[in-house]
Amino acid sequence: MNERTLFTTFWTNESTTTRNVLARIPEGSTYRPDPKSRPAQEIAWQIVCEEKMLIEALETGRAEWAPSPLPATMKEVLDAYDEQRARMARRWNELPDARWDGTLEFFGSQRPGSTMAWGFLFDIVHHRGQITTYLRAMGSTVPQIYGPSADEP
């Protein structure tokens, strides 16, 4: 298995888990564990925007962080994630090798495409983990991630 196939496999699996976590965010929740922390819906939207930015960067050769405004509802966030996720595998597979193996412009510096992809996948997993620490405090449950949770043994 080559690195890109491995990445696509991991991305697909992690996006399923991410979707399960995002679906647990209660509609209308403004919970944040600290005034410096962001609410879960805002973190969820960052995940959506990071995924969009990454695939577009790999397609065009240039990363531009210009997230769309935060949707008013969690349902809108989930709908956007579902729509984007449905097209991601095809988009990963259609990337020219030169984009995956080449460099991308990222905030004024050049970064290897594959390294950037893995880095963003890990960042998305990190933000997903942040959300899981909010879920019970918001009155929700934590889904299985890499194995059972206290809520889903």
Each model region followed by its residue ranges:
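Active-site rim elements
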Residues: 2-8, 74-78, 118-121
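Short, contiguous alpha-helical
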Residues: 8-22, 27-69, 105-153
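Acidic catalytic patch
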Residues: 92-107
